[in-house]
UniProtKB/Swiss-Prot annotation:
HSA domain boundaries: 344-417
A cellular component term, taken from the record's GO annotations: Swr1 complex
Catalytic activity: ATP + H2O = ADP + phosphate + H(+)
Gene designation per UniProt: SWR1
Name of the protein: Helicase SWR1
Chain positions of motif DEAH box: 756-759
SUPFAM superfamilies recorded: P-loop containing nucleoside triphosphate hydrolases
Principal location: nucleus
Location of the Helicase ATP-binding domain: 640-805
Length: 1450
């Protein structure tokens, strides 16, 4: 019994599990359907075999409380209420068999958990079986498929009555995929025959042609992962029992019916079935209606009938090969083309239509692709996760190795730091040892230096004495020193082409030079009666002694020591000014007699031996054209003394004192007196190369000058034949080209080498300095305006360049070859003097050092300032001309300042915005046309419209039709208004008779009386009644009464007309007029002169009135018409030509000149009057008066302006007044610039030269003008200073007046007023020739625009435009860029071009040195501060020093 009970219990448990699994399956299908309807609304893509496993699915079941766990828990809870057990639902459904788990809860027993697991497994197994059965029933049959063969035999002892069982371990059946393999290869299963299993399979419902047996490896190789989808083709890899016939499950879905609340939404079906509805469509095209479709069908039927008829008649025949209809050979009307019909390439819409089944197939294929892609993505994601996990474990496994490597790396780093520290310590010890050794060596050098300095001072004294001595025989000195000087320290490395020549050739050359000098002397004597020199100075004892002594006293006594010895930055202009005046100019000032011997004795006393420092006077060379000033003559004497004493020197006169002419006079002196014609080499900056050539042609035309420039090919042509004797006397070359062609210049021997702007070769380490030092030259002269720089090494480089070795009394002594000693003697005391500015009390050592420096420099340096010779230079006077604004300028100025945008800009304090406002106001001040151009007014031209001609013709026809309407509509004769016709038709007798016979008046009166009586009676009856339309009798009576009233009015009017006609009277009568008529005599000729003015032709009238039209035709109409000729002259093209009337056709009238052209142009276009150009601007009004005064006084003026557009206005102004002028702006080429300046200086008829301040200042010398007019001031004051220097130069013989135009009550006057409060105008604009931002950085908006303009603005306007932290204040170039943004594009280009020209020489001298200036001595400050870290280790340091000193370290 116990066994039976157990068996029954097991059966009951198995049956319960079976029922629960079926319930579980139905539950999953229903919940799946519920979820699909909830998510996708419809069941089109519903898959009953797919159980979703997502958070949304679980959330939905929990919200609806329909989870399987909750149902089971509720049932269990009801069953266990008595026992108090509580079950908590916690079941989760997963899709995969391995992932379907039930959370174990503490409140649930193990039996319940096992039961749920078994139910879940069995339910999923049933679902897989159902899915397999459903998929096999839908496989299409294939005719060529073979029967599936069994892989493994079934045991014979199995009962055949039972259903055969196929183990999933042995066989896996796979449904053949509808889609072929991508590679085109089919899977070939491995087949094993088994008859028993074959019979069992035949008993099943499955079609054997629909199955294939594959090996396990084939399926396993396809995918290592399995993902449950609704469209997978693989069979489940589950173990199943015996294959048996299973029932088909039919699912009936009853979706809930929609609740319709609006009867309009109820669908009324016109077709009972879908098939009938689809048949109702004739064609599946929306564009074609049913009527069009029927028409198309009829056309096709008719076309088919025609083809059939053609075949029957034999006109056409059917070709079965090409399946086309061809025409027969008989001559019948050609209905078709004989050519082969091309196939239709146009795809009609009907060809692209697909049936519903094809759409479903395509959708299935597309879905399959999506499923496969999703599968691949999941596989790829799983692989990535696996790789990440693998890398993680690898990282964990290698952690120990990495730790060991890190420890090893740290140990190496510690060892490296220790090694570096030890090495650094030894380096410091080595530096300390070297410093100690240096100190010892310097101490020895100081002792030796003092001895060497005393020798140098003694040598300088001897040199100065030898320089000032008067040699009795100069030829002997020249011959004795030429050989000695040629053997300099660098002459060993030189080779001269002149060495190849024989001594005979040299002697011949000297004889030729003597002959040439004699010829030039005779020619110069004929051209000039006698050499002229300027008047002597008041001090007769002038000489080098007085100049140098005064300079020394001023330097020693003045507190500002660096003013004399330490000069500032060099001026930007490289061109030396002309220092001579032509003979023609000197003749205007007065005639000078030839200097006699007495005058020479006054200037230079005969007893020169009493003054040891006196300079021997030399005669003015006859080759020099012009007259030297006194200080220039003294410079020539000093240069000649240098030559006579075999000494080189530095001519360091201030810029503008004529270093160029002094150099030319020296070369002329050598040619005339010493018969030394060179060749001489002059090295100048590129910018003044042509200027030097012009100076030689002007003042020394007797020299043959070779200007060395051009491309390499041109320079090679210039070098051809230059080794021949007397090929040239002077060669002028730039610094850049002489370095490039230095090998050619080194091979030639030069007499004199002159370096202009020599302060630019101050870097003795540069290749340029080394190249020039090695040239084969006998003597050298340096020309510079700033010889002494703040760096003593730069001064030494110049002195060493002059005197590498010196010869005194036939002995060679070293010059300034020791830079360290030179710096040791003079560098530190002078640097200390420069740093303090001379404010500290000088000690005796410093004074002695300065005196020694003076003593060393005195023989080699000559410097004069303009302050010393200012009495010999014409004066410069500056005038401020205040100009009132014109009415138009004042209106534009005030309008701009009153704008809200301008006030907002000023209140913002933005620098660029304020500068833009300043630029606009400056334009208004210069000329209002720069701010707002006066417009050219024109009339609005109305063109002829399309309907104009037709409307004009219609109006003409209408006027002609209604021309006589006034005669027909109103008869004026009847109302007696045409009384003049009475005299022409009737006499007075007729009119009187008609008036008497007018008897109708009585009849009319009687009729009126009767009507009046009847009318009064009727009116009294119906006075208070209206027309009654209700009663027909009353209505008729009232209507007739109205009719009688109208008739009465008509009779009254006729009576009125009759009375008017009968009352006509004549004034004179026809008989009187006939008596007074006189016979008419025709005469076609009229001799009255008054009639001649009336019959003048149109052209004559216009010619006579041309003057009147020119003066008074000033009003321009607002609009004019384009066909004015047709309207005024009758030039209408619609006038039909008539030979009798003589009307000219329109085509001929068009060819005629328009006689009204002048009037039309004058009245249509109004140009501004030319005089308004002057009267619109206050500055031009002042300029007109000033130019007239200057022209009357014989002066010539230069007008400068910053803006290029102002030059255009000035051109119009000068043309209007008829002045001869020339123009030079930034667009003028450099080669044209020299031509313009020479023409202006040579032609006194040219009164004005207008220039742009941005036109560049190199090579421009306008000494022909004595007046400078600044129309406006430039942003950059250095530009204005440069403009002044173009006129106020040494070559100027007259005083220079500078006029600066300033507009009153504007920003210009405010800036000038503020500047005058701080300093004088010259100091504000010019600060040593550099651009200054002082007046910009210190001016505020209130200072610029005035207190009345910015009175209501914030406090920010009282602050400076640029703050103290602004970069523009620190860097002037940045300020220039900011100001350039507010200027016009042409002005900015001109300014940049001018700056490039000024800085072109910087490129020649821009050469970075290999090493920095200064010695390599290491001071104690160079030691690193890390020494403090080793405090307390002095014994180690002492040991290291002893170790190094004993020689063990090296």
């Amino acid at each position: 019994m116990s066994k039976n009970n157990k068996l029954n219990g097991k059966d009951n448990r198995q049956s319960k599990i079976e029922k629960l699994s079926e319930l579980k399956l139905r539950h999953d299908q229903l919940t799946n359907e519920l979820y699909h309807l909830h998510e996708y609304i419809s069941l089109v893509e519903y898959d009953p075999f797919y159980i979703p496993n997502s958070e949304n699915y679980e959330r939905l079941l929990e919200e609806k409380d329909v989870t399987w766990g909750s149902i089971f828990q509720e049932k269990k809870q009801l069953h266990n209420e008595s026992s108090g057990k509580k079950v908590r639902r916690s079941v989760r459904h997963l899709r995969d068999s391995g992932s379907s788990t039930i959370n174990e809860l503490d409140t649930m027993s193990e039996n319940d958990i096992n039961l749920l697991k078994e139910v879940d497994i069995l339910a999923k197994q049933k679902l897989q079986d159902l899915k397999l059965q459903f998929s096999n029933s839908h496989i299409k049959k294939k005719g060529n498929t073979k029967r599936a063969k069994i892989v493994k035999q079934v045991p014979n002892h199995q009962d055949k009555s039972e259903s055969p069982q196929i183990s999933e371990r042995d066989v896996k059946t796979v449904v053949k995929d509808l889609k072929p393999n991508h590679r085109g290869s089919e899977i070939k299963p491995e087949i094993m025959e088994s008859s028993d299993v074959k019979n069992e399979i035949e008993n099943c419902d499955f079609n054997e042609k629909q199955l294939k047996l594959y090996k396990d490896d084939d399926i396993a190789s396809e995918s290592d992962f399995y993902f449950t989808t609704s469209s997978e083709d693989e069979l489940p890899n589950k173990r199943r029992g015996t294959i048996k016939r299973r029932k088909r499950i039919n699912l009936y879905v009853n979706p809930p019916k929609a609740v319709i609340t609006n009867p309009d939404n109820i669908a009324n079906s016109h077709y009972p079935t879908l098939h009938e509805y689809l048949d109702s469509f004739k064609i599946l095209e929306d564009d074609m209606t049913n009527e069009e479709y029927n028409t198309f069908i009829k056309e096709q039927q008719r076309f088919a009938k025609m083809i059939k008829k053609g075949i029957e008649t034999g006109a056409l025949k059917y070709d079965p090969v090409t399946e086309t209809v061809q025409p027969s050979a008989r001559k019948v009307p050609n209905m078709f083309s004989h050519a082969k019909v091309d196939p239709i390439q146009y795809m009609y819409k009907e060809q692209n239509l697909h049936i519903h089944q094809e759409h479903l197939i395509n959708q299935g294929l597309f879905s399959s692709k999506l499923v496969q892609n999703r599968k691949k993505q999941r596989i790829a994601g799983a692989k990535k996760i696996a790789q990440m996990i693998e890398q993680h474990f690898k990282h964990i496994a290698g952690a120990e190795d990495r730790r060991l490597k890190e420890n090893e790396k740290q140990r190496k780093a510690i060892a490296r730091n220790i090694i570096q520290s030890v090495k650094k310590r030894w380096n410091l010890a080595e530096k300390a040892y070297r410093i100690l050794k240096k100190d010892e060596e310097e101490q020895l050098k100081r002792i030796q230096g003092k001895e060497h300095l005393s020798k140098m001072l003694e040598k300088s004294s001897k040199l100065l004495g030898a320089q000032l001595k008067q040699h009795p025989n100069e030829d002997d000195i020249e011959n004795s020193t030429s050989d000695d000087f040629s053997s300099t320290g660098d002459s060993d490395n030189l080779s001269s082409s002149s060495d190849e020549e024989s001594d005979d050739e040299i002697n011949d050359l000297s004889e030729d030079q003597k002959n040439n000098i004699n010829e030039l002397k005779t020619s110069s004597t004929s051209a000039f009666s006698s050499p002229e020199i300027s008047s002597p100075s008041k001090n007769p004892d002038l000489g080098l002694n007085s100049l140098l002594t005064n300079d020394f006293e001023n330097e020693s006594n003045s507190s500002d020591t660096n003013e004399e010895f330490i000069m500032g930055d060099s001026d930007t202009s490289h061109s030396d000014d002309e220092n001579l005046t032509d003979d023609s100019e000197d003749s205007n000032d007065g005639e000078h007699d030839t200097t006699s011997d007495n005058e020479k004795s006054d200037l230079f006393p005969a007893d020169t031996t009493n003054d040891p420092l006196a300079v021997q006077d030399v005669p003015t060379p006859s080759l020099l054209r012009g007259t030297l000033r006194t200080y220039q003559k003294q410079g020539l004497n000093w240069l000649a003394s240098l030559y006579n004493n075999n000494t080189n020197g530095i001519l360091a006169d201030e810029m503008g004192l004529g270093k160029t002419i002094q150099t030319i006079s020296l070369l002329s002196y050598l040619a005339c007196e010493k018969h030394n014609w060179g060749p001489h080499l002059i090295v100048v900056p590129t910018s003044v190369l042509l200027n030097w050539e012009m100076e030689f042609k002007r003042f020394a035309p007797g020299f043959k000058v070779l200007t060395y420039y051009g491309n390499p090919q041109q320079r090679k042509e210039k070098r051809k034949g230059w080794n021949k004797p007397d090929a040239f006397h002077v060669c002028i070359v730039s610094y850049q080209l002489i370095v490039q062609d230095q090998h050619s210049f080194k091979r030639k021997k030069w007499q004199y080498m002159v370096l202009d702007e020599a302060h630019n070769i101050k870097n003795f380490r540069s290749t340029r300095w080394q190249a020039l030092l090695n040239f084969n030259t006998q003597r050298r002269i340096l020309l510079t305006g700033t010889p002494l720089q703040n760096n003593i090494a730069e001064l030494w480089s110049l002195l060493y360049f002059l005197m590498p070795q010196t010869v005194i009394d036939g002995q060679k002594v070293s010059g300034f070859a020791d830079l360290d000693a030179f710096q040791q003697w003079f560098g530190r005391p002078v640097d200390k003097l420069i740093e303090t500015g001379g404010t500290y009390e000088q000690d005796n050592e410093t004074k002695r050092t300065v005196e020694k420096l003076h003593q060393v420099l005195r023989p080699y340096l000559l410097r004069r300032l303009k302050a010393d010779v200012e009495k010999q230079i014409p004066g410069k006077y500056e005038h401020i001309v205040y100009c009132k604004l014109s009415k138009r300028q004042r209106f534009l100025y005030d309008d701009f300042m009153s704008r809200a945008q301008t006030k907002a800009t000023l209140a913002s304090g933005n620098f660029m915005s304020i500068v833009n406002c300043l630029m606009q106001l400056r334009k208004v001040c210069n000329h209002p046309d720069l701010f707002e151009v006066r417009p050219i007014k024109t009339s609005f031209l109305f063109g002829e419209s399309v309907i104009a001609r037709y409307s004009e013709r219609a109006n003409s026809i209408t006027r002609r039709i209604h021309f006589h309407d006034k005669d027909t509509l109103v008869d004026l004769q009847n109302i007696n208004l045409q009384f003049t016709n009475n005299d022409l038709e009737k006499t007075s007798y007729h009119t009187n008779t008609i008036n008497k016979l007018a008897c109708i008046n009585e009849f009319v009166e009687e009729v009126q009386k009767l009507r009046k009586q009847n009318a009064e009676e009727e009116r009294q009856k119906s006075r208070h009644l209206k027309i009654n339309t209700q009663n027909i009798s009353n209505f008729y009576e009232e209507f007739m009464q109205q009719k009688l009233d109208e008739q009465e009015n008509k009779i009254n009017f006729i009576g009125y007309l009759n009375s008017q006609r009968c009352s006509r009277k004549t004034v004179y009568g026809m008989n009187l007029i006939r008596l007074l008529e006189m016979p008419h005599v025709s005469n076609n000729c009229i001799d009255d002169p008054n009639y001649d003015d009336l019959i003048k032709p149109l052209q004559t009238r216009l010619l006579d009135g041309r003057t009147t039209i020119e003066k008074f035709a000033v009003l321009t109409p607002g609009a004019v018409t384009s066909n004015i000729g047709e309207l005024t002259l009758g030039m209408d093209e619609f006038v039909t030509p008539n030979s009798k009337s003589g009307i000219i056709p329109y085509e001929e009238l068009v060819q005629l000149d328009n006689p009204f052209h002048q009037v039309q142009t004058k009245l249509t276009i109004a140009f501004p009057d030319k005089s308004l150009l002057q009267y619109d601007c206050g500055k031009l009004q002042k300029l007109a008066i000033l130019l007239q005064q200057l022209k009357d006084g014989g002066h010539r003026a230069l007008i400068f302006t910053q803006m290029t557009k102002v030059l255009d206005i000035l051109e119009q102004f000068l043309n209007y007044h008829g002045y001869l002028y020339m123009r030079l702006d930034g667009a003028t080429k450099i080669e044209d610039r020299q031509i313009l300046t020479e023409r202006f200086n040579s032609d006194p008829k040219i009164t004005v030269f207008i220039l742009s301040s941005r036109s560049g200042g190199l090579g421009i010398n306008l000494t022909g003008a004595d007046t400078v007019i600044f129309y406006d001031s430039d942003w950059n004051p250095a530009m204005d200073k440069q403009c002044q220097d173009r006129c106020h130069r040494i070559g100027q013989t007259r005083d220079v007046h500078i006029y600066r135009f300033v507009s009153e009550h504007t920003i210009e006057s405010n800036i000038l007023k503020k500047a005058n409060q701080k300093r004088q105008l010259d100091d504000v604009i010019i600060q040593k020739g550099e651009f200054t931002t002082d007046y910009f950085s210190k001016l505020s908006v209130k200072d610029l625009f005035g207190s009345d303009v910015v009175g209501d603005l914030p406090v920010i306007d009282t602050k400076p435009l640029l703050g103290s932290d602004s970069e523009a204040i620190k860097d002037p170039k940045k300020l220039e860029k900011l100001l350039a943004q507010a200027e016009d594009e042409d002005d900015v280009k001109a300014a940049n071009s001018a700056l490039r020209e000024v800085n072109v020489d910087d490129e020649d001298f821009d050469e970075s040195s290999t090493n920095k200036t200064g010695g390599n001595i290491l001071n104690g400050d160079d030691i690193d501060e890390d020494v403090d870290e080793y405090e307390g280790t002095n014994h180690v340091e002492e040991y290291m020093l002893r170790f190094i000193a004993n020689g063990f370290y090296f």
